[in-house]
Amino acid sequence: DGKLCLVKGQGEETWALPGGFGEVGYSPTENILKEIQEETGYSARVIRLLAVFDTNRYQLQSRQYVKLVFECELLDGNFEKNQEISDLAFFEREKIPALSTKRNTEEQLNFLWEVYDGKRDLYCD
């Protein structure tokens, strides 16, 4: 429905896209579906890859990571607080709360909206 699912980590005041590290032996699609289930309690369907981000482009880290961001449709389930996530909410693009900039930046979300709206193809750093 065009709203963005964001989560708040335990002990954090800011929000981020759900996600996590990919595990060996899983495809990117399998990994994101696993992470969505673990973090949100929802089952989902991957629609398409929206972006590939180089984490060092946005915040220099001791290790370089590549983030794959997918558009997904949540199918069913219920959110319950867990050891990683304290809250989950769906936001309209004009009402995005303060972001956990170590995980997602406003610039990255703007790229995602451009792809979602069909204003550009897949975004890749």
Each predicted region: which residue ranges?
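Short loop segments at secondary-structure junctions
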Residues: 1-3, 73-78, 93-95
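Nucleotide phosphate-binding site architecture
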Residues: 5, 23, 97
